[in-house]
Amino acid sequence: MLRVQTPKSLDPTKPDPARPDADGAPAAGLDRRSFLAAGTTLAATAAMAPAAALAQGMMPGQGWPTGPEPVRYPSDVWLVHDDRFRQYMIGNTPLRREWTGSLWAEGSAWNGPGRYVVFSDIPNNRQMRWDEVTGQVSLLRMPANFSNGNTFDWQGRQLSCEHSTARLVRYNWEGPWPEVLAEEYEGKPLNAPNDVVVHPEDDGIVFTDPGYGSHWWYEGNVRELELPTSVYHLDPQNGQLTRITDEIFKPNGLAFAPDYSVLYVADTAPTHHPEEQAKIIAWDVEDNGRRLTNRREFAVLERGFHDGIRTDVDGNVWAATAFGGEGVDGVHVYAPDGTKLGQILMPEGCANLAFVGERRNRLFICGSQSVYTLYTAAQGAHVT
């Protein structure tokens, strides 16, 4: 309830100590004109109440904050293509925008012991940190050499793919400066590493090198690519770098199957080869990632392209999707046989995602300018 105090000189029930006749009786000067003036004051003040309430983030007459907007369950972000998708949906959970302020959010990686996500804001040349406990986003590192993909190895050390320096680096415990793990192949500089994963058997590192960080100043650098766009394996024991495939136009996001028998790589070919379609390519993994065999098309996207990808414990592939427009942008989910199970529709194009939380049942999604979370009934595979 809005309470407004009537001015003393206009209140007929209160004495005015400044007046000699202040005995509780109506003041002699309180005439009809004065009462009309008081009514006008009250009306104006009451009219201002809704605006004042909104300015304070409250719904007039309700008493709760105006944002985020309430969502009626079940959320309409779930889109089913195959009934098998329903087992991964939760009806009473919203898509939450946790933070906004990036230009192109990328490279999300979950740190379990620290309960945080590191992600890149490439054009702003910074790495950000989302704290699961507080829900707050803070600056982790700036400058960050226009880093893109990030992950944590099996010792908990952060690996980052740097665009402007065209190298793969690792942040060791003694920090703060990163150790360079790879920056050239056969005497030529790498194009610009993009995304990275780590095999648990021997800590072997697999990363993609499409060169996006060398195409525009906006995301790092401008220079001619001297190497074919490729996927590499790095042996951390001896530093040997091996090209394991160049049979892909623009290798981007990548992920192992939960048993490490398959490597999935997103091909964002249409960005520089408009006659080609965006795809996810699959290979069988040999020798802990040192060799790839049995190349095959796993999924083909008619519009837009898949970028960062993850797998769950059932072997499904969850693919961040952008540049497809409404009805396409968001997350696409594929069964191990390549059947599209469903989608999570998003208000922005999405470049990356990660399963986070103690149970790895919550999606952290990098939209273009914002980051989001969504609880699922799936559980992310325990892969980097």
Task: Cite the ranges covered by each PLM segment.
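Short linear motifs in intrinsically disordered/low-complexity regions
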Residues: P12, P17, A22-G24, R32, ...
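Sequence-structural signature of mature extracellular/luminal beta-sheet repeat domains
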Residues: G39, Q56-T384
